[in-house]
Amino acid sequence: MKQRDLVKELEKAGFEFARHGGNHDIYKRGDDEEKIPRHREINERLAKAILRKWGL
């Protein structure tokens, strides 16, 4: 899955970009936080796990 597609899904769920980490971008929704690897392509299993974690 492309990183931008995963980010779009998180933003639809109310997450907003918070900051850049070392190799990850951090998105927040209230007290919830998710770290997204800064790569063009993200492993499908990882992307699905992130979406499943937030019920998306």
Briefly describe each language-model feature range.
Residues 1-20, 28-56:
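Basic nucleic-acid-binding interfaces
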Residues 25:
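A cross-family detector of function-defining hotspots
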